[in-house]
Amino acid sequence: SSIVVANHPFGLLDGLIICSIICDVRKDYKILINDEVSQIDQIREYLLPIKFSTLTEDIKKNIISKKKAIEHVNSNGILITFPSGEVATSSLIFNEANERRWKPLIGSIINKTNATIIPVRFFGKNSLLFHTIGFVNNNLRRILFIRELLNKKNQTFKLSIGKKILSLQNERLNNRQIVDKLRSIVVNIN
């Protein structure tokens, strides 16, 4: 069983790229994904939706997805995750886009499995327009996700797969420590 942890510079495209690589080798993968993009019928069977909200109904749905993720990994499946939960963004218009702090949910899943962790780093970022709009209003930025997907047509993308991590269970880290450690590993992959 394996858990892929990756940075998230582009949005939907990151997931499409990883899924296209993995599905050439194995079909038993699931992707932990933002609920907003989990409505695509053709791929719904591969998706475990997560909603980043404090509403009771959303928390209940997240618990179900987390349980399914743990069961999937413990059944020797592959789980693909983008632990930041949102696309990398720039704090100032002309600065580099930075990966947000990772959510401890992935640490919780790792602590309940004995999965091999596969760190993946994507290189690149979305357009200046995307980051400029995000600087003005993060909700407006969401409108540009499809544009960002389409404007990358016929481009080549660079990603690197880091050294696999056989287990973190011996280190006795809490969920936050796990994701902080893995984030550091991913953003430092060359």
Listing of model-derived features with the role each one plays in the protein:
Residues 3-58:
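Catalytic core of membrane glycerolipid acyltransferases/transacylases, capturing the structured
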